[in-house]
């Protein structure tokens, strides 16, 4: 079990969240409470969250989530992790869809707890604003690595274990290639570091695009 070298990464707080996004989430919470109190008898109105979330395609969104400083710290921490924990594929998946990853709950519980806090306090309100649905218990939180040696691209798939996926690039600009393709909509170039791609992965056929050089961390 890996212990974080940078204690800031273990803090269950909002310091790592983009300021405008965090403010929008806080301003949206009363709207969510009001909607739930109406027990489905009224429509959900547009919220402050809708001002920071951009719809790329139907049901596919992007939003600035993490501060660049947090992503930079996490990349440095990953270099320490690799000395103690290997990136490994999920053997429950078929080989074409296996991506080298570190599952945080099993290997880095301190970081898992801080990311779980982000799901509860930031992402779940976003899911409520977009889809009027709670999704507070993540099936898995992991760090993935696309590279030429181990896995340069993914294959078309649906995520059977998750209704909603949140993919956050940690080091855009430090590799060539990458991005995400959606079967019905085309390709999306790598988002800026810390910006989240949010979509219902159970119903949207998608894949990671080839990395030409470097390590793409998500």
Map each language-model feature to its residues.
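Intrinsically disordered terminal extensions flanking catalytic oxygenase cores
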Residues: 1-55
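Short, functionally important structural connectors and interaction interfaces within domains
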Residues: 17, 24, 57-58, 62, ...
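Non-heme Fe(II)/2-oxoglutarate
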Residues: 31, 35-133
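Catalytic core of non-heme Fe(II) oxygenases with the double-stranded beta-helix
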Residues: 117-218
């Amino acid at each position: 079990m890996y212990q974080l070298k940078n204690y800031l990464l273990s803090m269950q707080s909002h310091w790592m969240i983009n300021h405008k996004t965090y403010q929008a989430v806080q301003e949206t919470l009363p709207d969510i409470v009001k909607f739930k109190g109406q027990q489905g008898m009224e429509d959900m109105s547009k919220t402050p969250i809708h001002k920071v979330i951009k719809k790329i395609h139907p049901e596919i969104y992007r939003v600035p989530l993490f501060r660049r400083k947090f992503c930079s710290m996490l990349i440095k921490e990953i270099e320490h992790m690799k000395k103690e924990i290997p990136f490994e594929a999920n053997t429950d998946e078929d080989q074409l869809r296996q991506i080298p990853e570190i599952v945080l709950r099993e290997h880095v519980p301190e970081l898992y707890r801080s990311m779980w806090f982000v799901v509860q306090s930031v992402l779940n309100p976003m899911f409520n604003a977009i889809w009027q649905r709670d999704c507070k218990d993540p099936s898995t939180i992991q760090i993935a690595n696309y590279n030429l040696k181990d896995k340069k691209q993914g294959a078309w798939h649906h995520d059977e274990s998750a209704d909603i996926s949140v993919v956050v690039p940690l080091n855009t600009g430090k590799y060539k290639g990458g991005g995400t393709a959606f079967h019905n909509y085309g390709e999306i170039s790598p988002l800026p570091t810390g910006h989240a791609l949010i979509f219902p992965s159970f119903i949207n056929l998608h894949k990671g695009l080839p990395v030409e050089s470097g390590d793409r961390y998500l």
